[in-house]
Structure formats: C-alpha cells, structure tokens
C-alpha cells in the first residue's frame, strides 16, 4: 500500500519549500483524518484478531503508514526546534484549546500513549511491556523537565547579572525539545512493536481517534460551552 507523501517540513527555509508549523500541522491532521485512518479502519474490519501481522499484509501496511505519520510529526517538531527552540518547548499557536492540558515540552505527554493502550484491555504480555515503557517514561520525564527548569533558571540568573547568553539559552532549549521528541518516538515504536499485528493496529486507530478528537468542531464546541459556564 503506497504511503501518501508527507507534507513539507515546517521552518524558515526557502519560500515554497517550508511553511509555518500551523500549516504543516493542519496538513498533517488532514492526512491522518483521510486517507490514513479510513484505510486502517477498513483493514481492521477485514482482518481478525488472529492476524499474523506480517508487514506485507494490508492491515500491517496500513498500521505502518499511521505509525510513520506520527513519527513524521515528531521529526517536523525536531525541525521546528532547530529553527525556533522557544516555540518548540511551548504550546504553539496551532494547538487546539483542548490539547493544552495534555501538552509536555511542546507536544502530548508520552504517558498519554501508555494510558491509551491500557484502556484497550491489553493481554498480560502486552501489559507487562507497557509497564516497562511506563518505567522508562517515569525516569525520563522528570529528568527532561528538570533540565528545562535549570536552563530557565540559569538564563534568569545571567539576565539579572547582565551576562545572559541568548544563543546558548536557545541551544539548550533545542536540545531539551529534541530529547522530549526522542522519548515520544521511542515510546510509540516500542509499544507498536510489543503489540504487533492486529493489536498494534487497534492501538494506532485509538491513538489517531484521540488526536483527531481534540480538533473535532463538535467536541471543541462542547468544550467552549463548558468553559463559558463553569460549575454548571
């Protein structure tokens, strides 16, 4: 199954070659919404839970295309971090208001991915693999968060003394963003590999639905209504 070409990477490159992250992300969501998610759903409906999961069958090909699409998203965030590190570690203007509570260092918290997999009632073997990934996340997230905090504190102290090095500060922010995206990429790859076949496809379908739901107009309308009438 041929994969659709990825949208051009974000950044400040030559006109026509690159575009703002807002435009990239809109195109990325559009491709996930169609054709990738419908192709995956059709492959799931025509397969069974006993699918062998060979990477040449339609189900595995559709799942691999969705996984590659998420990996391309994090690669795009890496490219954005090299162009504008401050934006890469914050909530970009392309994010929906519903996404904001779930963000960590510029994108979804990796623990959301393992929580999503747990909600699918995985087998004991897959649950054990998820536990291992969770332990890795619990070790890495505080380390990256502490590093970001130390970078911020060092810049504040240097600014007060009149010796702030903006270039070094941005370089550190870039490295933090790259490490966070590396963790996200590894978490998804490890979980997909552990699940395999039909379970991996179910997991990627659920992840796609979750991401798209945060940009669904009806969901956002209800979210805005709740914000407009707190406590009702």
Swiss-Prot record:
Q: Which GO terms describe its molecular function?
A: sequence-specific DNA binding
**Chief subcellular site?**
cytoplasm
Which Pfam families does the record match to this protein?
DOG1 (PF14144)
Q: Which GO terms describe its biological process?
A: DNA-templated transcription; pollen aperture formation; pollen development
* Keyword NAD carried by entry: no
Write out the entry's keywords from A to Z.
Cytoplasm
Q: Which PANTHER family match?
A: DOG1 DOMAIN-CONTAINING PROTEIN (PTHR46354), PROTEIN INAPERTURATE POLLEN1 (PTHR46354:SF9)
Q: How does it assemble?
A: Interacts with LECRKS7/DAF1.
Q: What is this protein called?
A: Protein INAPERTURATE POLLEN 1 homolog
Q: Which GO terms describe its cellular component?
A: cytoplasm; pollen aperture
Q: What does this protein do?
A: Required for pollen aperture formation, male fertility and LECRKS7/DAF1 function. Seems to be involved in operculum protrusion. Participates in the modification of plasma membrane at future aperture sites, possibly by creating close contact between the plasma membrane and callose wall to prevent primexine formation and sporopollenin deposition.
Subcellular localization(s) per the UniProt record:
Cytoplasm
Null allele phenotype: Absence of entire pollen aperture, leading to male sterility.
Q: Which organism is it from?
A: Oryza sativa subsp. japonica (Rice)
Statement: the UniProt record of this protein carries the keyword Magnesium = no
């Amino acid at each position: 199954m041929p994969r659709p070409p990825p949208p051009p990477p974000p950044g400040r490159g030559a006109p026509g070659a690159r575009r703002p992250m807002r435009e990239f992300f809109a195109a990325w969501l559009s491709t996930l919404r169609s054709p990738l998610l419908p192709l995956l759903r059709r492959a799931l409906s025509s397969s069974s839970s006993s699918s062998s999961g060979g990477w040449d069958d339609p189900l595995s090909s559709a799942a691999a295309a969705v996984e590659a699409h998420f990996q391309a998203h994090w690669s795009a965030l890496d490219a954005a971090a090299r162009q504008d590190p401050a934006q890469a570690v914050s909530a970009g203007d392309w994010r929906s208001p519903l996404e904001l509570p779930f963000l960590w260092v510029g994108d979804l918290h990796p623990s959301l991915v393992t929580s999503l997999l747990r909600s699918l009632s995985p087998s004991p073997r897959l649950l054990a693999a998820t536990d291992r990934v969770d332990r890795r996340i619990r070790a890495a997230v505080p380390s990256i968060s502490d590093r970001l905090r130390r970078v911020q504190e060092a810049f504040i102290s240097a600014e007060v003394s009149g010796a702030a090095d903006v270039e070094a500060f941005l370089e550190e922010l870039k490295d933090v963003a790259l490490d966070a995206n590396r963790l996200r990429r590894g978490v998804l790859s490890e979980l997909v590999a552990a699940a395999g076949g039909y379970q991996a496809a179910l997991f990627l379908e659920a992840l796609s639905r979750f991401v798209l739901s945060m940009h669904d107009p009806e969901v956002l309308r209800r979210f805005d209504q709740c914000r407009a009438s707190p406590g009702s």
